[in-house]
């Protein structure tokens, strides 16, 4: 079975950082993710996805990613249920993020000058914070051109083919 989620979106508010009784950090947040299509009135709609992240990445997210931050997360979808104070069963579906990455600098997000920092932090449970280099733009060396565009057709009969 495969249960993988990759999301890129903006945080709708600062993450809520809490600690379990055994002092394990857990942060909850909502990510606004644009849909790939526009509505009938021409506007792009967004989905608001509830997420949770645990341990050191939770503390890092709460410290570094604030409301409006563009982040990428990887994780899985999880469902759970509990009984509320009125005795009703409540079902919750959320994304459990394994790690996150800041996708823009604070200066860019706040409308300031664009700094030289265009990468982010990759915060997973198996390593400490590490800088991710910005993606490099590779030139298109005629990749869209047909490699056979200037050649003549080949004279091949069906008898020449091995199948």
Curated annotation (Swiss-Prot):
PANTHER family: SINGLE-STRANDED DNA-BINDING PROTEIN
Region (Disordered) residue spans: 109-163
Statement: the UniProt record of this protein carries the keyword Cell wall biogenesis/degradation: no
NCBIfam families: PRK07275.1, ssb
One of the protein's GO biological processes: DNA repair
A Pfam family assignment: SSB
Gene3D superfamilies linked to this entry: Nucleic acid-binding proteins (2.40.50.140)
Annotated SSB domain residues: 1-104
Comp. bias regions, Polar residues: 131-140
GO terms, molecular function: single-stranded DNA binding
Function text: Plays an important role in DNA replication, recombination and repair. Binds to ssDNA and to an array of partner proteins to recruit them to their sites of action during DNA metabolism.
Low complexity biased stretches: 119-130
Protein name: Single-stranded DNA-binding protein 2
Motif (Important for interaction with partner proteins): 158-163
Annotated SUPFAM superfamilies: Nucleic acid-binding proteins (SSF50249)
HAMAP family in the record: SSB
Alphabetized UniProt keyword annotations: DNA damage, DNA recombination, DNA repair, DNA replication, DNA-binding
Gene Ontology CC terms, in alphabetical order: nucleoid
């Amino acid at each position: 079975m495969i249960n993988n989620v990759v999301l890129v979106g903006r945080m709708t508010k600062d993450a809520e950082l809490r600690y379990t009784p055994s002092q394990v950090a857990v942060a909850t947040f909502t990510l606004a993710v644009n849909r790939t299509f526009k509505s009938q009135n021409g506007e792009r709609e967004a989905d608001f996805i509830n997420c949770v992240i645990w341990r050191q990445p939770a503390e890092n997210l709460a410290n570094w990613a604030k409301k409006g931050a563009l982040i990428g997360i990887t994780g899985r979808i999880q469902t759970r249920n509990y009984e509320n104070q009125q005795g009703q069963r409540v079902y919750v579906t959320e994304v459990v993020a394994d790690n996150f990455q800041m996708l823009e600098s604070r200066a860019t997000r706040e409308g300031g000058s664009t700094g030289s920092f265009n990468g982010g932090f990759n915060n997973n449970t198996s390593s400490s914070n590490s800088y991710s280099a910005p993606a490099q733009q590779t030139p298109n060396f005629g990749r869209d051109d047909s490699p056979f565009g200037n050649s003549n057709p080949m004279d091949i009969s069906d008898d020449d083919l091995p199948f």
